[in-house]
């Protein structure tokens, strides 16, 4: 019997690529996404790439009762990969409370529901922003955690502490935290990639959307940094 994995934010950029890799590695995947920054068509494209249609539920991880019912519906989930989060640094400075609610409560709900439904493991999508302004480059896991420079970065720092405290309390939950830098690119099939809803909050979607003709031009601000 295939092992079942829940991927939150599974129609997003990193999430969709992870779902493809999981399915191609023989896992049974359940996707949860509220589609706030992605499109349900991604599920169709995942099926085109892998030949397997993952289970998909349009659901917000903030909805505790909804998530509780999901774990019951898809009994036997063995692990969670938690990507679902608000992720734009600039926007987090404008809407800090939105980021604290979305990014903290969603994780807390999962950590509370995991023991109830006998889910043992979680991989948490953290961020390189937890390092603040590092003393040296390149940054390694041994680098000290510095003061976060945005509410987004602070939510990732706090979430890591929540996970550490939960595990240290004797909870049966096992956790891994992955601190990503800036992923770019798309699947070789070009069926999945980074195509956020609305105005992109980071550079690469602007570049690709301009190349595709979705946007008329790409603005470059400043003239004091030589481009190699």
Where are these regions (language model features)?
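Conserved beta-strand segments of alpha/beta enzyme cores
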Residues: 28, 53-55, 174-176, 217-219
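Active-site beta-alpha loop architecture of Rossmann-like, nucleotide-cofactor-dependent enzymes
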Residues: 38, 86-90
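N-terminal Rossmann-like NAD(P) cofactor-binding module of classical short-chain dehydrogenase/reductase
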Residues: 78-81, 123
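N-terminal Rossmann/SDR dinucleotide-binding element
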Residues: 2-79
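Conserved NAD(P)H cofactor-binding loop of Rossmann-fold oxidoreductase domains
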Residues: 84-87, 126-127
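A conserved pocket-lining segment of Rossmann-fold NAD(P)-dependent short-chain dehydrogenase/reductase
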Residues: 92, 144-145, 181-228
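Catalytic helix-loop patch of NAD(P)-dependent Rossmann-fold dehydrogenases
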Residues: 94-97, 101, 105-112, 116, ...
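Residues at the starts of beta-strands that form the adenosine-phosphate
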Residues: 4, 28, 120-121, 174
């Amino acid at each position: 019997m295939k092992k079942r994995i829940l991927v939150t934010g599974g129609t997003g950029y990193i999430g969709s690529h992870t779902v493809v890799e999981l399915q191609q590695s023989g896992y049974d995947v359940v996707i949860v996404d509220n589609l706030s920054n992605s499109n349900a068509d991604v599920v169709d494209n995942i099926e085109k790439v892998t030949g397997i249609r993952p289970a998909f539920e349009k659901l917000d991880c903030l909805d505790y009762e909804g998530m509780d019912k999901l774990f019951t519906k898809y009994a036997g989930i063995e692990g969670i990969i938690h990507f679902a989060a608000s992720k734009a640094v600039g926007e987090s400075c404008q809407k800090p409370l939105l980021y604290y609610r979305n990014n903290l409560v969603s994780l807390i709900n999962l950590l509370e529901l995991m023991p109830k439904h006998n889910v043992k493991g979680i991989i948490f999508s953290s961020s390189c922003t937890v390092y603040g302004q590092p003393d040296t480059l390149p940054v390694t896991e041994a680098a000290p955690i510095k003061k976060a420079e945005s509410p987004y970065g602070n939510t990732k720092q706090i979430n890591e502490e929540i996970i550490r405290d939960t595990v240290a309390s004797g909870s049966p939950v096992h956790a891994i935290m992955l601190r990503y830098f800036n992923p770019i690119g798309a699947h070789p099939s070009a069926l999945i990639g980074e195509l956020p809803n609305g105005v992109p909050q980071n550079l690469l979607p602007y570049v690709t959307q301009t190349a595709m003709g979705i946007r008329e031009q790409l603005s470059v601000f400043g003239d004091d940094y030589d481009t190699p």
